[in-house]
């Protein structure tokens, strides 16, 4: 227990989150490049957990992206998502399928297309979404399965995409597990 408490205390002393800072820099630079290319200012950020998703939303909102973010996960029960769905449902009666989960997905995609710059998603968005209006995919966390990377990229790299899809992969080079996963993915699918 003493050892665990030592780790907890060390974690609390961390004042700088270099990975999130790097994400912020990557977004700013990528949005600049998108503007030069005439592409929409859109980014799809994938993460493995809803806790990281919530943290990234909070961090990005505190650093210039307030009101420009939509979350996509398997739950979809946060107040903003519920409000997005309610507004979409009332404004788009002809699009309503009657299948609530499908309608929620459509509402979030429409909101991302029309109102948000950034969608932060878990693997729930890895399949079945058409986001060809977005040309930036950020893999904040890398999954072990190369097929999941291809599915993530495939959300934006679809028929109707008018711009090259840029993929940013985050790898902590000081973390052996991250480097190992990246090297495996690199050898299998050349990301």
Question: Where are the regions a protein language model picked out?
Answer:
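SF2 helicase motor core recognition
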Residues: 109, 120-134, 154
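A short beta-strand element within the Helicase C-terminal
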Residues: 130-141, 166-168
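Conserved Helicase C-terminal RecA-like lobe
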Residues: 1-116
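Conserved segment of the helicase C-terminal RecA-like domain
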Residues: 156-184
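Conserved helicase core region in the C-terminal RecA-like lobe
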Residues: 50-51, 118-124, 144
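Conserved small/polar residues in nucleotide/adenosyl-binding loops
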Residues: 189-191
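Phosphate- and divalent-cation-binding pockets in alpha/beta enzyme and binding domains
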Residues: 55-56, 130, 148
């Amino acid at each position: 227990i003493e050892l665990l408490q030592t780790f907890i205390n060390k974690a609390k002393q961390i004042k700088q989150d270099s990975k999130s800072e790097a994400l912020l820099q990557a977004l700013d630079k990528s949005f600049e490049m998108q503007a030069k290319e005439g592409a929409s200012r859109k980014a799809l950020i994938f993460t493995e957990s809803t806790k990281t998703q919530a943290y990234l939303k909070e961090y990005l909102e505190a650093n210039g992206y307030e009101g420009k973010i939509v979350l996509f996960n398997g739950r979809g029960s946060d107040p903003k998502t519920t409000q997005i769905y309610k507004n979409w449902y009332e404004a788009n009666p002809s699009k309503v399928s009657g299948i609530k989960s499908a309608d929620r997905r459509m509402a979030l995609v429409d909101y991302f297309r029309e109102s948000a710059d950034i969608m932060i998603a878990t693997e729930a968005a890895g399949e079945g979404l058409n986001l060809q209006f977005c040309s930036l995919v950020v893999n904040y966390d890398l999954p072990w399965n190369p097929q999941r990377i291809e599915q993530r990229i495939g959300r934006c790299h679809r028929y109707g995409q008018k711009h090259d899809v840029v993929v940013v992969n985050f790898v902590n080079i000081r973390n052996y597990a991250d480097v190992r996963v990246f090297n495996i993915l690199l050898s299998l699918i050349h990301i």
